[in-house]
C-alpha cells in the first residue's frame, strides 16, 4: 500500500545538497498515507517510543483521524489537509529514520500556496550526518505539490515548510543542536519579538478543565521558504498565512475554546507588507 517517495535533488534545502550524493546502501523509503498501510504501525511505534515519554506524541486515534483528511474533497475557500509519514528502513528492516507531517492548502479563490507542518523527525544515531536527514526534510515538498494539484492550484505555487521549535535556551544543548541542524539546512526563525507564537495546550480536555487553566506553549516557527531561503525578511501577510494554516490544522481536532487565545494572538499580528525579520534559528 505504501510506495517510495521521489528523491528529487532540486527539493533538497541549500544546506542539504550533499544528500544528493549520499551513499545510503540498502535504505528503503516508504511513503505512508493510510492507517491501513502495514508499515504505519512500525512508524507509529517508533515515533511513540521516542516522543511519547516526553509528552510530544499524539494518540493513535488522532493520527487515524488525520489520515481521513487525505480523501476529503475540495470546498471553495476552505483548507485541505494531507497527513503522511515517511519511514526509512535499513537492510535489516530496522528503522533508520521516521518523520510525519501535514500539508495544508486553501482552495480557490484563496491564493495558491502550500504550508507543510513538520511534526516529528527521528534519525537513528547510526545514520546521523549520513545525508539521510536531508532527504527526510525534503520529501514533504512533493506531498505539498500533490495537495496543490488536488486543490486545483498551480504546482509552482509557493511552498513553506514549518517546524515548531522551543525557544533557544543556553541550558538546553539538545534543543540547540536541533536548531543548528535546521539552520545549516537553510531554515529561518520568525522573530518572536515581532510575532510571538503559541502552540496549543496538548493536554487532554478533561485535564485542562480540571486544572482550570489553559496552558498554550510559547514556541517559535522556523521556516524554509522554498526557493527563498536566503531572504532575511518576509512580508507579514505571508507569515500570518502560514500560521493561520497551522492553526486551521489544529482547529480540526482541538476545541474552539482551547484555540481561542491562539487565534486572538494571531489577529494581533502585523499585516500587509510589513517586513518581518527572519533570524538564525539558534539566535538567542
Model-predicted segments: where are they?
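A conserved beta-strand-loop-helix scaffold within acyl/acetyltransferase catalytic domains
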Residues: 33-34, 44-125, 147
